[in-house]
Every structure is written in structure tokens, then in C-alpha cells.
Amino acid sequence: MSEKAILSCRDLGKSYEEGPESVVVLSGLQLELHPGERVAIVGTSGSGKSTLLNLLGGLDTPSKGSVWLAGEELSALGEKARGKLRNRALGFVYQFHHLLPEFTALENVCMPLLIGRTPIPEARQRATALLERVGLGHRLEHKPAELSGGERQRVAIARALVNKPGLVMLDEPTGNLDSHTAQGIQDLMLELSTSMRTAFLVVTHDMNLARQMDRVLHLQEGHLVAI
């Protein structure tokens, strides 16, 4: 593709020291994602999928190579600048949603906007519009404990998208849901990635979800292989 990548990594590697030995988890990874592209990463438990996601999201430091997000090399940024870039250009969705239990659905979705110093009235308006878009306009004032598993994951997706990031990373987004609810979340993700032109990078064991992506990559023995 000629369009500039929203995310790329070059010769990415990660290893850990265990006594006198160095254990290589990831080695020589190359990856590019472009606006609106949907990519799944699959692999066995312990293959390094979550480690890779943490490296690509700037939550961990590679042993080798570089990661570029929205045109910025993550390793060249200080911690504060890296945090600002993540809040602006990147959204995260986890298997267990990680919503703040003491806040309502609306307040949870407002949070990234408020961190970015968006005025409260504007933040509430944007968060409300996105919650309505994911089918939760009637649940704005409900706290996570009052929502179903599928509803909580919809709130998490809305929170990830509220800053209109170029990329959303999802770590097993349907892994804790029944098949019917998981299909609804999959359909929602596909619709939003198309309509908002957001790139989605999904780590999953769910091959049904993976097959709906534009590309599927298998993480095996520290390397990414196209399926």
C-alpha cells in the first residue's frame, strides 16, 4: 500500500535474562498496519502475543528494533510524550474490559477525553454520541456491575474509540463472552473499523473472529507468519 502506515515495526525483538541465559521471545518481526486495515494475530498460549501487543503499544521496551506509531518512533519519546501519543493515536480493548467500577458507562468513556483536557461538556457530548452508536444510549448512567458482559465490552470499545485514534489494539476481546454475544461484538468492531477508518489489531484465539480480518498472522517461535 502507498498510504502511510499508522503502525509499523522493524526488526523487532524481545528477550529476557534468566540467570546466565538469554531467552528470546520475539525475533526480527516486521509489521505494517494502514488506516482502516484489520489484522489478527493468532498463536498458542505463551507464544508471546501479549508481549508483542505491549511492545507495539509502547507499554514495554523492545530489546531490539523499533516501533513507529502515527509517524513517531516510540523509543525516541520520553515517558510523558509517549503517554500523550498513546492517548491521542491508540485505543486498547482487553478481554476483561478494565472499566473503572466506581464510574458510570458515560464517565468511563469520557475518561480519555478528560485526560486529554477536552472540556467536560464536549467530552460528555462525544461520549454520549459514541455510546448511542454502540447501542448503549439507554445505559449511560449504569455502572459496570449493572451491565452484562457484552455491554461492558461495548463500553470498552466506545472508550477505545472516543478519541478517534488511528489504531485500536484488542487483546482477546471476545474471549470472555458467549458465542452469540461474541458475534455481536465482532459485527460491531467490523462496522466501526469501516465507518471510522480505524485500523484494528486483534490478538485472539477465536479463529472465527480472525478469519473476518483482512489479514491473519501466526506468531510461532518468535516470528510472524502470514496465514
Swiss-Prot record:
> Which positions bind ATP?
G43, T44, S45, G46, S47, G48, K49, S50
On whether RNA-binding is a keyword of this UniProt record, the answer is no
The protein's GO terms of the molecular function aspect are: ATP binding; ATP hydrolysis activity; transmembrane transporter activity
Q: Does the keyword Cell membrane apply?
A: yes
What is the membrane topology listed in the Swiss-Prot or TrEMBL record?
A: Peripheral membrane protein
Sorted alphabetically, which InterPro entries does this protein's record hold?
A: AAA+_ATPase, ABC_transporter-like_ATP-bd, ABC_transporter-like_CS, ABC_transpr_LolD-like, LolD_lipo_ATP-bd, MacB-like_ATP-bd, P-loop_NTPase
Where does the ABC transporter domain start and stop, copy by copy? Answer: 7-227
Cellular compartment(s): Cell inner membrane
Q: SUPFAM superfamilies recorded for this chain?
A: P-loop containing nucleoside triphosphate hydrolases (SSF52540)
Catalytic activity, EC: 7.6.2.-
Which of UniProt's keywords are assigned here? Answer: ATP-binding, Cell inner membrane, Cell membrane, Membrane, Nucleotide-binding, Translocase, Transport
| Any one Pfam family match given in the protein's UniProt record, by short name | ABC_tran
- List GO BP terms, alphabetically: lipoprotein localization to outer membrane; protein localization to outer membrane
Q: Which domain of life is it from?
A: Bacteria
Q: Name one GO cellular component term.
A: plasma membrane
Q: How does it assemble?
A: The complex is composed of two ATP-binding proteins (LolD) and two transmembrane proteins (LolC and LolE).
State the protein's purpose.
Part of the ABC transporter complex LolCDE involved in the translocation of mature outer membrane-directed lipoproteins, from the inner membrane to the periplasmic chaperone, LolA. Responsible for the formation of the LolA-lipoprotein complex in an ATP-dependent manner.
> What's the family?
Belongs to the ABC transporter superfamily. Lipoprotein translocase (TC 3.A.1.125) family.
Q: What is this protein called?
A: Lipoprotein-releasing system ATP-binding protein LolD
Q: Which organism is it from?
A: Pseudomonas fluorescens (strain ATCC BAA-477 / NRRL B-23932 / Pf-5)
Gene it is expressed from: lolD
